[in-house]
Amino acid sequence: MSDTPTLALAKDLLSRQSITPEDAGCQELMIKRLEALGFTIEIMVFEDTTNFWARRGNEAPLFTFAGHTDVVPTGDLTHWNTNPFEPTIIDGMLYARGAADMKGSLACMVVAVERFVGEHPNHKGSISFLITSDEEGPFINGTTRVVDTLQERNEIIDMCIVGEPSSTSHVGDVVKNGRRGSLTGNLTVKGIQGHVAYPHIARNPIHQAMPALSELATTVWDNGNDYFPPTSFQIPNMNGGTGASNVIPGTVDIMFNFRFSTESTVDELQQRVVEILDKHDLEYDLDWIINGLPFLTDTGDLLTAVVNAVDTVNQQKPQLLTTGGTSDGRFIAQMGSQVIELGPVNATIHKVNECVNVEDLEKLTDMYQEVLNNLLA
């Protein structure tokens, strides 16, 4: 039995070792298919990252499929049951690095658009693709740079589906209609280095920092809302000392991270952190990295179209959640766009033996096509 168009394209994409920020020819495969449909292609290379913007039509609304061709490293190959770049089907599951995150989605997007354009060559509005090879890496030269370019020429995305693996047990059981923001602080608390036997002529920055860190960890930053849980504060990294047992360190470095809801702003969180640090009379340096702002699509044509499309295919409406980490949707949402994430089951992403249900890929293709039918037919 021959492969379906979705499965065949997925296998072709998965056979390419596009470990971030490499693309390994994946985008060329997609571009050829889209050019045949009348898409105008614009390749955007920024340093080590390859991106492309493809558009069919010049009218509003502008609907976009967004995704990435890069994948995370495989890890120890001896822990894989198959070659991660030789897509293999076992018991109805397609195994390969990127099967779920997110080359499977890319194949579904392309085939869905091929079918839709074949049925509706004079469709309403415009369809576009925003594809990058820098989602799994530092996300500096990928989607964010393409969005900047589009905004500079006032080309604004109205609605966007990001193909990130949103589902939990079967495709379409969960869609993400928002994401929390991410704010990282790099804090250096300064003390005075000395001998542990003479603490009176030294100043231990670890001891000094602990009460402030305790307060930061126990502070209620907000109460969340109907769509987001309360803002969370975590310390993922802390480093101080020389490694010797008889030396009081001169500094301690603490990295902390907020995952914050729409109930808090970056300025508010930064101000409250500084107030707590100053209250404890610390000598410190503090640098901030805004990894992404929260976004939410709680109403609108896109949300309605996605919910109805999933219901048509699954005979069950999806659950709307904002859980999980950040995605490139945060950059697109800054344009004022409606953004929804709909993709495969995420149970094996970034793990060895990453896989996706072959039937789910067919259903996801149908869902994407139905979204287009609902919006642009």
Curated annotation (Swiss-Prot):
Stated name of the protein: Succinyl-diaminopimelate desuccinylase
EC number: 3.5.1.18
Known function: Catalyzes the hydrolysis of N-succinyl-L,L-diaminopimelic acid (SDAP), forming succinate and LL-2,6-diaminopimelate (DAP), an intermediate involved in the bacterial biosynthesis of lysine and meso-diaminopimelic acid, an essential component of bacterial cell walls.
Names of required cofactors: Zn(2+); Co(2+)
GO molecular function, one term: zinc ion binding
Enzyme class: hydrolase
Pathway(s) this gene product operates in, as recorded in its UniProt entry: Amino-acid biosynthesis; L-lysine biosynthesis via DAP pathway; LL-2,6-diaminopimelate from (S)-tetrahydrodipicolinate (succinylase route): step 3/3
Family per similarity comment: Belongs to the peptidase M20A family. DapE subfamily.
Coiled coil, from the record: none
Keywords in alphabetical order: Amino-acid biosynthesis, Cobalt, Diaminopimelate biosynthesis, Hydrolase, Lysine biosynthesis, Metal-binding, Zinc
A UniProt-annotated Pfam family: M20_dimer
S-S pairs: none
Residues annotated as binding Zn(2+) 1: 68, 101, 164
Catalytic residue list: 70, 135
Cofactor binding notes: Binds 2 Zn(2+) or Co(2+) ions per subunit.
HAMAP family the UniProt entry points to: DapE
SUPFAM superfamilies the record matches: Bacterial exopeptidase dimerisation domain (SSF55031), Zn-dependent exopeptidases (SSF53187)
GO biological process: diaminopimelate biosynthetic process; L-arginine biosynthetic process; lysine biosynthetic process via diaminopimelate
Catalytic reactions on record: N-succinyl-(2S,6S)-2,6-diaminopimelate + H2O = (2S,6S)-2,6-diaminopimelate + succinate
InterPro entries: ArgE/DapE_CS (IPR001261), Bact_exopeptidase_dim_dom (IPR036264), DapE_proteobac (IPR005941), Peptidase_M20 (IPR002933), Peptidase_M20_dimer (IPR011650), Peptidase_M20A (IPR050072)
Annotated residues for binding of Zn(2+) 2: 101, 136, 350
Assembly mode: Homodimer.
